[in-house]
Amino acid sequence: LRTIMGIMRPIRKAPGTKLVSYEAAVDGTLAGGTSVAEGDEIPLTKMKVEPKTYGDIEIAKYAKSVSVEAVAKYGADVAVEKTDEAFLVALQNKVLGDFYTFLNTGSLAVAATTWQQGLALAKGNVLDKFASMDRDVTEVVGFANILDFYGYLGDKEITTQTAFGLTYVQNFMGYSTLFLLPAKYIARNKVIAVPVENIDLYYIDPADSDFAKLGLNYTVQGETNLIGVHVDGDYSRATGDMYALMGMKLWAEYLDGIAVATITPAETKSTKTVKAEQ
């Protein structure tokens, strides 16, 4: 997930800590400059550091169970491995669904008349926003309705990729990654753009020693421990049970650094003529 989204800053939250980041900025205007005479004391520029508090991460707990009857009927490959994969994808989609909902609250509004123009203006506006804050942008990721994407392509061929339930295309019209989503996540005629520098991933490590003190040992994989799982056999029910623990939140540091482009197709000449005649 981190690799696909290009997330730059995974931030581990230790138990007992609060989610707080700090922003530094010039308090007022720069002092000094060419007005300082030779030998005069150079005035200090006043700076300020302000804390920014985020909503706390809630721990989510899930479990699934596979019976010996299911294994006998379908085999372990289907009853266990396939359901394990589907279970983990569903967990990821829960996190992504919350993130997509949050993206739609972006306050950098953009108006466009075509889908292509919407993509271009959405990216241009976030680049302009971050440049005005003297912030660097290395990559911009986009989110679009999948039907709008294929409607734009028409009979043109382009290679899309699918991983962990995500459909996306890389290096498309200036976007490092363009995610193609169904209408339940992003409406038609809407495009969202956000720099990867504006995406933070806060997470709780399920393998944290504080949890182990409860006798809860979760297995994690990868560089960032996002989802912890534990598999145990329940002889009293003759089932194999998988337990999952996760606590993560995808967050955008600047709401006005998320461009939401709304596309309103321009009226055709014939349509305007008909209305005029009416």
Regions found by a protein language model. Give the residues of each.
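Long, contiguous amphipathic alpha-helices that act as assembly "spine/axial" helices in icosahedral shell
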Residues: 47-111, 238-248
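Alpha-helix capping and helix-coil boundary motifs
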Residues: 71-79, 114-125, 215
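Sequence/fold signature of self-assembling virion shell proteins
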Residues: 160-278
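Short charge-dense sequence patches
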Residues: 27-45, 71-77, 223-239
